[in-house]
């Protein structure tokens, strides 16, 4: 399929960085892009193992369905045949495969992974446990892509995003606000507020962690305080980087 410029940029970032975390607006085609990237990885490399984890099995299955659809629509000379094809997995003749599982039990415990995908990560309750379990499966050089719309602050997705922005966890952060889509305008955004409400539109369109959560205080007021009073430290010290300095002392 033909890519928009922002999708081309995201694809290049996938290739450049081992770990990517995406805070995205809805309906930007990013799940489809990840599916196409997964198929490329499987098709042109032997014995690659892609695992998709989502809140529900049906959600994870959608990505396998997209990979299957893309493969079926390839020109004949690009197809290499399949050795396994069902609703939750697709294995190519070269040994590469993609599987879909729900976020339950031993979801992250698998054979060595080439690519781990978390879909709608902000809504997976036990994702921290799954991520810890997956570390050993990624230790042989696997990559990870985490994508989601925001779901308030303080959850695992929000923490990973904040740490990624500060450069402390190895994740490259990719923010995809609704305005990156060339065919959307303010009229479209206003329509989303009418359909979804202020909170729903903040979550689904604006990549807004504060506005998407269950806040007692008006999210717009919280955002004003954040933009007005909160600033990044000028320096971080200590072996773990947890001594934050906003202003150096004046000894004069």
Language model features with spans:
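Phosphate/NTP-binding elements of NTP-utilizing enzymes
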Residues: 1-252
């Amino acid at each position: 399929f033909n890519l928009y410029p922002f999708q081309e940029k995201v694809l290049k970032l996938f290739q450049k960085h081992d770990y990517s975390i995406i805070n995205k607006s809805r309906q930007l085609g990013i799940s489809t892009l990840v599916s196409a990237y997964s198929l490329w990885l499987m098709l042109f490399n032997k014995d690659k193992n892609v695992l998709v984890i989502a809140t529900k099995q049906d959600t994870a299955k959608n990505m396998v369905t997209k990979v299957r659809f893309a493969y079926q629509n390839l020109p004949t000379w690009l197809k290499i045949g399949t050795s396994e094809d069902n609703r939750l997995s697709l294995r190519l003749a070269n040994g590469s495969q993609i599987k879909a599982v729900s976020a339950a039990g031993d979801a992250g415990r698998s054979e060595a992974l080439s690519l781990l995908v978390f879909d709608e990560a902000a809504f997976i309750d036990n994702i921290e446990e799954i991520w810890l379990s997956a570390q050993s499966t990624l230790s042989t050089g696997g990559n990870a892509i985490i994508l989601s719309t925001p779901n308030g602050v303080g959850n695992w997705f929000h923490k990973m995003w904040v740490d990624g922005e500060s450069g402390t966890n190895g994740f490259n952060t990719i923010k995809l606000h609704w305005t990156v889509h060339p065919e959307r305008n303010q009229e479209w955004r206003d329509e989303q507020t009418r359909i979804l409400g202020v909170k729903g539109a903040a979550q689904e369109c604006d990549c807004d962690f504060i506005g998407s959560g269950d806040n007692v205080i008006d999210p717009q007021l919280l955002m004003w305080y954040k933009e007005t009073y909160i600033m990044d430290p000028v320096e971080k010290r200590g072996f773990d980087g947890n001594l934050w300095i906003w202003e150096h002392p004046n000894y004069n």
